A protein has these predicted regions:
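Active-site histidine-anchored catalytic micro-motif
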Residues: 1-163
Length: 163
């Protein structure tokens, strides 16, 4: 099975400037993460954008939908910032991308920090996209959720079933 990974930025790919203390984007860490995880999957990686998810708008979501629609692969993982991941999942589900299994994932801590959850979440998403039926899902914290039954708990910092 071939899997397409769409990179959109988010905390997942942020870098830390030690002089100013600010977080910024340079390039995706995906290739390093896949190498470090010893992935042997057939993957096509495409950077769509590198933005903080708080900057994600309808135009950005339309770009992501278009890239998913154009993808030859039936399995797609999207790296995305956690703040608006659920909104993007909704846009993908409403776009009616029949026959595609799409899993969004991200990180609460930048991969550049040794304590990041990014590598674990990426591995989980790559596993889930291979076994879940067509649809749109969010994969965080070792769990997967249907797009319409998940929320980010801002108090605990984890994704959970939405009420």
């Amino acid at each position: 099975m071939s899997i397409r990974i769409l990179v959109t930025g988010g905390t997942f790919d942020k870098e830390y400037d030690e002089l100013t203390g600010r977080l910024y984007f340079r390039d995706t860490h995906l290739d390093e993460m896949l190498r470090r995880g010893r992935s042997r999957l057939d993957l096509a990686v495409e950077t769509v954008m590198m933005i903080d998810s708080l900057e994600m708008d309808d135009r950005g979501r339309a770009q992501i939908v278009a890239r998913c629609r154009a993808a030859a692969e039936p399995a797609i993982v999207i790296t995305h910032g956690t703040d608006t991941m659920v909104e993007t999942a909704r846009a993908l589900a409403e776009a009616g991308l029949a026959g595609k299994t799409i899993v969004l994932t991200g990180a609460m801590v930048p991969y550049a920090f040794g304590s990041s959850d990014g590598l674990f979440n990426l591995g989980s998403a790559l596993s889930f996209v291979q076994v879940l039926p067509p649809g749109v899902y969010v994969a965080m914290n070792g769990r997967h959720f249907p797009w319409d039954a998940v929320r980010k708990n801002r108090e605990t910092g984890v994704f959970e079933v939405s009420p």
